[in-house]
């Protein structure tokens, strides 16, 4: 019987020192919230699907991350969100994009996967699905934080100076060291049955055009789950990740080259940056339950639970740990 695994990330980019504490707090809180869904205290078998949704929902509520509340703003100063969710047994998936004024895009993606006949919808259709299946319509700008406004202001100031930080090729442009907004979030889980589920949610990138769609809702780029190979959630410069098809390439390395989750993630993240120039990262759970955590950006917040211990980090090989309970 497989050992349950839960691995999450809170985004890759040029994350300043001032935001590390908030990232760590949010990562640990999401892990604790979701672990009970994966490994119930009663000893009953938990589910990877519930665990992934719970972890991502927790981070969507936290302004330290770029998903849900605290999402980045487009050039019009509005939040447009996207998310995807995928199960590895039957390859079911739900992908949504261009959502506005709802708190949990990951839950909308789950409703699409479980109850509808389409796999990917966006804009008005995604909005209608969200509101017709139980999501509350939030007041206009309820998801906008002061940090996100400040970052957009910085972005526009750089444009007037002839610089476009969108092409810095990180999820957070290098010049925006004081950026208090967050990064894409994701989770990968394997339950007692060997079921692998992956979920990813984001507000995109500051200063994007209205209507821009990134890698997060695209299967094979931002998210992919296959019980026979593993599960991957990615983060970073979306245009780069889409062009490289990062999630699928990592799983192909596991399947065709016999690589471990860690080796496959390292190889493909490095090759993506070498070929295209953009940076990013990925978390991976292999079909055997092994973990992979890799990034070419300056930092990437991540965490997982193993042997009643939370392990977490944000840079290099530095690993922190503390008891789960």
Curated annotation (Swiss-Prot):
GO terms for biological process: asparagine catabolic process via L-aspartate; proteolysis. The keyword Flavoprotein does not apply. Substrate binds at residues 212-215, 235-238. Cleaved into an alpha and beta chain by autocatalysis; this activates the enzyme. The N-terminal residue of the beta subunit is responsible for the nucleophile hydrolase activity. The active site is at 184 (nucleophile). Disulfide bonds: none annotated. Heterodimer of an alpha and beta chain produced by autocleavage. This is Probable isoaspartyl peptidase/L-asparaginase GA20639.
